[in-house]
């Protein structure tokens, strides 16, 4: 038995105090995102990336990459700033073999020292998708166990993460800021203001290798069962979850704060 002597008894937090603390945390994070957007107004994508990696969140952020059609542009910039920044790839078990090959090519070319593959929990697959066709029956749940949950686990302990999203990709991303407050972290979008022509110019200027499926009409490349080539007048993400009432996998659609 141990004795506390004259120490005051511990005060357990009440539900109200916890709610207040959470609200304060959210407000502080939203304020930080607003400050970063003001700080990065007029900055180039490389300047935003360099500032985030070396000044604002040194050692406390990760890059999340799909290794899709445009991925080489952001990854090239990251390699110019730091080859040691963690590069997270969500390996759903449903990717095109071409994407896995492309991932290995880019990681080797850019010399990243901390590239990680995030996989779903085997227990979740056994429970929810033992036959491997959950994508056709419940695509939201499939994305949840294969993408959202593995990423959330990998981001524990980090303060920020970097994405390659751009405003031109869909109408839902038209107002995409450089910094967002989301799920207790800052999400950074250095390429938010880029257009498709700038992406193509970067590929040519830096002689970046194309995704093997790009020339087949794939512009947004996710899991093989849920991705198709796009038509001439479709936006770049029209080939994702075609025929379903779904446009995002879920890693970017949690409640903004």
Task: Annotate the PLM regions.
Residues 2-257:
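Nucleotide-activated chemistry modules centered on ATP-dependent adenylation/adenylyltransferase
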């Amino acid at each position: 038995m141990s004795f506390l002597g004259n120490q005051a008894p511990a005060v357990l937090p009440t539900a109200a105090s916890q709610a207040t603390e959470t609200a304060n945390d959210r407000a502080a994070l939203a304020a930080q995102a607003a400050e970063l957007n003001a700080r990065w107004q007029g900055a180039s994508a490389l300047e935003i990336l360099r500032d985030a990696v070396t000044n604002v969140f040194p050692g406390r952020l990760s890059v999340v990459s799909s290794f899709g059609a445009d991925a080489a542009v952001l990854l090239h910039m990251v390699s110019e700033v730091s080859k040691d920044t963690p590069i997270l790839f969500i390996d759903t078990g449903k990717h095109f073999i071409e994407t896995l090959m492309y991932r290995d090519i880019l990681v080797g070319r850019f010399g990243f020292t901390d590239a990680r593959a995030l996989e779903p929990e085997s227990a979740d697959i056994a429970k929810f998708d033992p036959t491997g066709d959950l994508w056709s029956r419940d695509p939201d749940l499939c994305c949840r166990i294969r993408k959202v949950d593995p990423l959330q686990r990998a981001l524990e302990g980090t303060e920020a993460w970097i994405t390659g999203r751009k405003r031109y990709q869909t109408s839902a991303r038209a107002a995409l800021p450089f910094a967002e407050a989301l799920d207790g972290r800052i999400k950074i979008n250095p390429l938010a203001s880029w257009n498709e022509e700038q992406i193509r110019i970067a590929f040519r200027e830096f002689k970046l290798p194309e995704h093997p499926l790009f020339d087949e009409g794939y512009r947004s490349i996710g899991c093989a069962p849920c991705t198709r080539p796009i038509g001439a007048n479709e936006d770049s993400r029209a080939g994702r979850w075609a025929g379903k009432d779904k446009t995002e996998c879920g890693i970017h659609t949690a409640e903004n704060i």
